[in-house]
């Protein structure tokens, strides 16, 4: 094998590994209950593949805290992350209810309709409401 073939084979292997890493990223990771900030994150592998995920944690004061925490996780997997926006989530597991609303002052408003679709993959038996009202 010449250098070009070795390089090409190595790049294909790296790309396959990043595709597998992307496939392993959960679509939803949010706090089990309460009202908290959330961000939508576009997770991107080394090529053109990407997926939008939802992250929201009650222990994070700022939307940027959530993004920075998750960005580090994705970097360790060889993935990039971009944040198109955020908002708030009200999570009531007893009532099987989620409400998505508001916006992030730093990142802007996430697409709440898309957020609802993503949340429904993890919470198919929940009532999920979206609103553009409130902060």
From Swiss-Prot:
**UniProt entry keywords in alphabetical sequence:** Differentiation, Sexual differentiation
Q: Which GO terms describe its biological process?
A: cell differentiation; sex differentiation
Residues where substrate binds:
37, 104-106
- Catalytic residues at 63
- Which InterPro entries does the UniProt entry name for this protein? Janus, Janus_sf
Protein origin, superkingdom: Eukaryota
Q: Where is the signal peptide?
A: none
Q: Which GO terms describe its cellular component?
A: cytosol
Name by which UniProt lists this protein: Sex-regulated protein janus-A
Q: What is the lineage of its organism?
A: Eukaryota, Metazoa, Ecdysozoa, Arthropoda, Hexapoda
């Amino acid at each position: 094998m010449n250098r070009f073939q070795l390089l090409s084979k190595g790049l294909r292997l790296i790309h396959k590994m990043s595709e597998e890493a992307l496939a392993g990223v959960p679509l939803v990771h949010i706090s089990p209950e309460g009202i908290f900030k959330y961000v939508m994150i576009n997770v991107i592998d080394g090529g053109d593949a990407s997926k939008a995920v939802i992250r929201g944690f009650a222990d994070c004061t700022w939307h940027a805290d959530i993004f920075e925490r998750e960005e580090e996780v994705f970097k360790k997997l060889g993935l990039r992350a971009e944040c198109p926006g955020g908002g708030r989530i009200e999570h009531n597991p007893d009532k099987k209810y989620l409400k998505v609303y508001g916006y992030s002052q730093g990142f802007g408003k996430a697409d709440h309709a898309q957020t609802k679709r993503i949340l429904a993959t993890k919470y198919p038996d929940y009532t999920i409401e979206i609103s553009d009202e409130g902060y």
